[in-house]
Curated annotation (Swiss-Prot):
Keywords noted in UniProt: Acetylation, ATP-binding, Cytoplasm, Nucleotide-binding, Nucleus, Phosphoprotein, Proteasome
Gene Ontology terms for molecular function: ATP binding; ATP hydrolysis activity; proteasome-activating activity
Modified residues (Phosphothreonine): 25
Positions where Phosphoserine occurs in the chain: 21, 28
Residues reported to bind ATP: 206-213
Sites of N-acetylmethionine modification: 1
Protein name: 26S proteasome regulatory subunit 6B
Pfam families the UniProt entry points to: AAA (PF00004), AAA_lid_3 (PF17862), Prot_ATP_ID_OB_C (PF16450)
Species the sequence originates in: Homo sapiens
Quaternary state and interactors: Component of the 19S proteasome regulatory particle complex. The 26S proteasome consists of a 20S core particle (CP) and two 19S regulatory subunits (RP). The regulatory particle is made of a lid composed of 9 subunits, a base containing 6 ATPases including PSMC4 and few additional components. Interacts with NR1I3. Interacts with PAAF1. Interacts with TRIM5. Interacts with ZFAND1.
Membrane-crossing segments per the record: none
Length: 418
């Protein structure tokens, strides 16, 4: 056996090797060994114990979830009870840490108070209006930014229906207003490419009845920007500090809704030349003017907010308001000349049923100084005279009588003021 290279010891060693390699010979159908069964059983028991443990944990988590829901509902009810009115209005001054702050009350006292955990800390900014608990003075709510109820922003359905075509004449004024107000809002890149800053504000001045407010209405109609209209006298309030606060609210509202246009009519009510004021009311008006100047200087050119001001007394305005950088463009609205009269008459009478005998050129050629409002009043009065006589056509005699009535009335008013 040794001669042919077969050793007995090696042969004996190969016999158990055959038994070990039996699973590879396709005899696995004979089933696992007893040792394998014991391993599988022990593994099964272990998994069963883990399953029972997980089931117990699941029940515990469900019970804990129910308890947390009850606590959450209880906490919500507690927060509602804490925030229930009446509450004390205060002012947030400074945050000490995440849970406490210093607030000021309406009585003038400052308090070191706790902050309700549900309040968003990002809303707590200096001078923000907050609600304090009536007993503990704890800070329980953050009020929205203050805005005066008289400040109205015209929505798309509230904007006037006055169009540029409804305004007779004033071609130069229309062009200047559109260049200073509309163009920077719609094509700001043009100014950027040229390398100049667009006008910040526009002053419209001229005699009464020359179309200043009407042109502002047309701007509001044709632009998609937010339009805020206030009258200068609205800033003069009863209590000290209310007027400057209202000015801040107007500009804050405009910045929040940019692009926006602020139209301040009768600006001479608060922007007259400053003098040595002797009364508290005069000093308050001057403080309103200072706040207005500050807000106009604080304009960020990246914010699309434009200011339009209108007045009949441009000579009484403070020079600080008129300087370039605040009101860059000043547009005069003079009494209409002959060409402007013709355009205004034709625009107003375009919707009227006039007789062929009515010669508008005769009224245009008359030398009387009349404004656009006077021309509109003449046309309206002639229509009323036709209605009085149950006619559907306005005759020449109606126009003549209306013209004399309006012009005579204006002369009497002027003589009265003299």
């Amino acid at each position: 056996m040794e001669e042919i290279g077969i050793l007995v010891e090696k042969a004996q060693d190969e016999i158990p090797a055959l038994s070990v390699s039996r699973p590879q010979t396709g005899l696995s159908f004979l089933g696992p060994e007893p040792e394998d069964l014991e391993d599988l059983y022990s593994r099964y028991k272990k998994l069963q114990q883990e399953l029972e443990f997980l089931e117990v944990q699941e029940e515990y988590i469900k019970d804990e979830q129910k308890n947390l829901k009850k606590e959450f509902l209880h906490a919500q009810e507690e927060v509602k009870r804490i925030q229930s009115i009446p509450l004390v209005i205060g002012q947030f001054l400074e945050a000490v840490d995440q849970n406490t702050a210093i607030v000021g009350s309406t009585t003038g006292s400052n308090y070191y108070v706790r902050i309700l955990s549900t309040i968003d800390r990002e809303l707590l900014k200096p001078n923000a209006s907050v609600a304090l608990h009536k007993h503990s003075n704890a800070l329980v709510d953050v009020l929205p930014p203050e805005a005066d109820s008289s400040i109205m922003m015209l929505t798309s359905d509230q904007k006037p229906d006055v169009m540029y075509a409804d305004i007779g004449g004033m071609d130069i004024q229309k062009q200047e207003v559109r260049e200073a107000v509309e163009l920077p809002l719609t094509h700001f890149e043009l100014y950027k490419q040229i390398g100049i800053d667009p006008p910040r504000g526009v002053l419209m001045y001229g005699p009464p009845g020359c179309g200043k407010t009407m042109l502002a209405k047309a701007v509001a109609h044709h632009t998609t920007a937010a339009f805020i209209r206030v009258v200068g006298s609205e800033f003069v309030q009863k209590y000290l500090g209310e007027g400057p606060r209202m000015v801040r609210d107007v500009f804050r509202l405009a910045k929040e809704n940019a692009p926006a246009i602020i139209f301040i009519d009768e600006i001479d009510a608060i922007a007259t030349k400053r003098f040595d004021a002797q009364t508290g009311a005069d000093r308050e008006v001057q403080r309103i003017l200072l706040e207005l100047l500050n807000q106009m200087d604080g304009f960020d050119q990246n914010v699309n907010v434009k200011v339009i001001m209108a007045t009949n007394r441009a000579d009484t305005l403070d020079p600080a308001l008129l300087r370039p950088g605040r009101l860059d463009r000043k547009i005069e609205f003079p009494l209409p000349d002959r060409r402007q009269k013709r355009l205004i008459f034709s625009t107003i009478t375009s919707k009227m049923n006039l007789s062929e005998e009515v010669d508008l050129e005769d009224y245009v050629a008359r030398p009387d100084k009349i404004s656009g409002a006077d021309i509109n009043s003449i046309c309206q009065e002639s229509g009323m005279l036709a209605v009085r006589e149950n006619r559907y056509i306005v005759l020449a005699k109606d126009f003549e009588k209306a013209y004399k009535t309006v012009i005579k009335k204006d002369e009497q008013e002027h003589e009265f003021y003299k």
